[in-house]
Amino acid sequence: MQIMVNDEAHEVSARTLAALIDELGYSGARIATALNGRFVPVTQRAETLLPDGAQVEIVAPMQGG
């Protein structure tokens, strides 16, 4: 399936947001996620299905000083 992750095209086999996070190597990381412009909390990632052509944003917090 073809989706966009952080504005980059990806061909993935994942069907849920949680599976996508694992497939892209983010499992265990503290991240925020959005699907098609809507925030998806960690508690809903396993049940959130990815449609073909989905726009996914994965954001990791940054420390500053």
Go through each PLM region and give its residues:
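Ubiquitin-like/PB1-type beta-grasp interaction modules and other compact soluble beta-rich domains
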Residues: 1-64
